[in-house]
Amino acid sequence: MSKIKITGTFLDEISHDIPHQNWGKKEWSQDFTYMKQMGIHRVVLIRCGYKNWLTYPSEVLVKQEKAFTPYLDLVSLFLELCEKNQMEFYFGLYDSGRYWTSGNYTEEIRLNKKVIEEVWELYGHSSAFKGWYLSQECNRNAGAIIDLVLGTGRLLQKGFGGKTGVDLTLHRRGEEHFTIHPANRKNNFYKFRPTF
């Protein structure tokens, strides 16, 4: 019987019910070392922010959502640790915790468009930055949530910073998340599909 390898994991720094923001550079560095030792080569930031909590100093979200500026730029740290440990990094978009959950998908898309542009400007240069993760969950009770997924995918399909495009192909997987995955980093061409 062959062993099933675990090659990827989520970084759930901003959480609904788990204490967060209690790790610094030392703790995250040790965690990445352990992940590399066990064969992890892909990490997905489950969300860059949730309501007022952020993983990076977003001017957009501080201004528009009254979010708190974090004491440490975790996105920068995660990218640095990914580069050091030869890991791929996937960026989870912002979860307002209010627009999309109340059916206002247009506002969630509008806000994430600004986040995407800001993040690409700040971190798109990193060799570890490999793609995007759409953190809003799809399930049978979410109504037209597919509009959010399609809208955000189309937004990325048009490109941001004039540097990339997305081949939008949806794969429904029950109540699981979707991600935008690069098919060809060299040509900045992305494919929209599940992460793992």
Summary of predicted features, one role per range:
Residues F10, E88-R110, G131-E137, V149-P182, ...:
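Aromatic-lined carbohydrate-recognition surfaces of secreted/lumenal glycan-active proteins
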Residues N52, N141, R173-G174:
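Flexible loop/turn segments at secondary-structure boundaries
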Residues S2-T7, G39-R42, E83-F89, H125-K130, ...:
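Short, well-ordered coil/turn segments that N-cap beta-strands
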Residues D12-K25, P57-Y71, G97-R110, Y133-A144, ...:
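The substrate-binding groove and active-site-proximal loops of carbohydrate-active enzymes
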